[in-house]
């Protein structure tokens, strides 16, 4: 058997090894930054740190040992970023499934994805405060479980035939585009950038209500709300947008995401940010 102990990349490495060696994997997440401990996919990277491809397995880890008394003493930035990656699951899966009649298990996953969003709005801010104080509160536990368990269950249910279609979207496409800049890849966390990408997704989708909710939530906990927060300038935008629209993450979308849509979304985000300083 193989024990996958650590964060997302360590866990994904051990899971991939388990798949290749045909050994059962048991996971022990030490941070709450993603759902790697419970899901049946590993994210593979190139040697320069850029995204390569997802590597799917037949089964998730046999068991995940989640010890909140350990996780509470890890750096808060990991759960902070994990929150952004988790609420993305709701928006990306529901938009991907819009106007479709998916098979039951996919529909179940899309329906469950709401639990990747609403509990974090309720508990996320206090959970971060409690972690800073070393307190394993109800809010902290609910946030940890949303990040590690709920998101993984949704991920497994909405992944059909080892294709990522319902399992990703514009938020992740923006993340992969941003991390093509070495200083961003090295200086920012996955969920932090995905959370920023969700703001753009909501603007492209003309979902003003949820945009305002997510913007205010991001602002309240320090997740990115503008270009400066992710260290890009107006001069970088063309490259970011070009890369974003080339990502397969937006292939399964109810409409084509164009460069013009993204340009307008970036403009709207900056204008909204300037008016809410």
Regions found by a protein language model. Give the residues of each.
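N-terminal small/polar loop signature for handling phosphorylated ligands or for N-terminal nucleophile
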Residues: 1-26, 126-140
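Structural motif
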Residues: 1-3, 24-26, 62-64, 192-195
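Short, basic, helix/turn surface patches
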Residues: 1-7, 52-60, 254-263
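A glycine/threonine-rich phosphate-anchoring loop and its flanking beta-alpha core
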Residues: 19-113
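Generic secondary-structure signature for well-ordered alpha-helical cores
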Residues: 49, 69-73, 88-96, 118-129, ...
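Active-site segments that bind and position negatively charged phosphate/pyrophosphate groups
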Residues: 103-216
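C-terminal charged capping/lid subdomain of soluble metabolic enzymes
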Residues: 207-277
């Amino acid at each position: 058997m193989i024990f996958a102990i650590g964060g997302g990349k360590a866990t994904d490495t051990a899971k991939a090894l388990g798949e290749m060696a045909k050994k059962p994997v048991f996971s022990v997440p030490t941070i709450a930054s993603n759902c790697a401990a419970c899901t049946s996919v590993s994210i593979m990277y190139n040697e320069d740190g850029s995204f390569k491809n997802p590597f799917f397995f037949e089964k998730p880890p046999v068991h995940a040992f989640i010890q909140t008394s350990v996780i509470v003493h890890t750096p808060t930035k990991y759960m902070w970023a994990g929150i952004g990656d988790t609420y993305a699951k709701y928006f990306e899966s529901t938009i991907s499934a819009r106007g479709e009649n998916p098979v039951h298990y996919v529909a179940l996953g899309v329906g469950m994805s709401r639990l990747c969003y609403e509990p974090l709005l309720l508990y996320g801010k206090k959970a971060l405060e409690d972690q800073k104080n070393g307190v394993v509160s109800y809010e902290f536990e609910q946030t940890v479980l949303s990040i590690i368990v709920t998101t993984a269950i949704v991920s497994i249910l909405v992944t059909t035939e080892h294709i990522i279609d319902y399992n990703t979207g514009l938020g992740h496409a923006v993340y992969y585009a941003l991390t093509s800049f070495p200083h961003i890849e090295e200086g920012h966390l996955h969920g932090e950038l995905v959370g920023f990408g969700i703001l753009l997704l909501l603007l492209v989708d003309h979902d003003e209500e949820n945009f305002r909710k997510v913007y205010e939530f991001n602002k309240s906990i320090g997740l990115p709300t503008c270009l400066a927060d992710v260290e890009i300038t107006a001069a970088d935008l063309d490259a970011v947008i070009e890369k974003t629209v080339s990502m397969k993450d937006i292939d399964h979308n109810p409409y084509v995401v164009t460069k013009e849509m993204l340009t307008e979304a970036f403009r709207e985000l900056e204008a909204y940010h300037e008016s809410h300083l």
